UniProtKB/Swiss-Prot annotation:
EC number: 3.6.1.7
Species: Coxiella burnetii (strain Dugway 5J108-111)
Keywords: Hydrolase
Assigned protein family: Belongs to the acylphosphatase family.
A molecular function (GO) term: acylphosphatase activity
Residue intervals of the Acylphosphatase-like domain: 10-95
Top-level taxon in the UniProt lineage: Bacteria
Catalysed reactions, as listed in the record: an acyl phosphate + H2O = a carboxylate + phosphate + H(+)
PANTHER family linked to this entry: ACYLPHOSPHATASE, ACYLPHOSPHATASE-RELATED
Record's protein name: Acylphosphatase
Keyword Hydrolase attached: yes
Catalytic center residues: R25, N43
Length: 95
């Protein structure tokens, strides 16, 4: 395992609160691209937002902190995330 591989991780996260209809997914995509992360983000039918993000551990930690803020119109009440097996995505997409 290379040093780069040791420093990379993926997370699966669910964000709750007023996170749909407030440009949350697009804001996550922009933040992820800014942090050079790959993965995806999508709305869930019950009102939460789900995402998978992969990249350098420091960038992932910045994203997990940012998820509590989101875009100005959002009102985040909870963020649950866990590390998962590293997956290989070519970019970050809104689903």
């Amino acid at each position: 395992m290379t040093q780069k591989e040791k420093n990379e991780t993926c997370i699966h996260a669910t964000v709750s609160g007023k996170v749909q209809g407030v440009f949350f997914r697009e804001s996550v995509r922009k933040k992820a691209e800014e942090l050079q992360l790959t993965g995806w983000v999508k709305n869930l039918s019950h009102g939460d937002v789900e995402l998978v993000a992969c990249g350098e551990r420091d960038s992932i930690m910045i994203l997990t902190e940012w998820l509590w803020e989101g875009p100005p119109q959002a009102a985040v009440s909870n963020v649950n995330w866990e590390e998962i097996v590293v997956e290989d995505y070519s970019d970050f997409r809104v689903r």
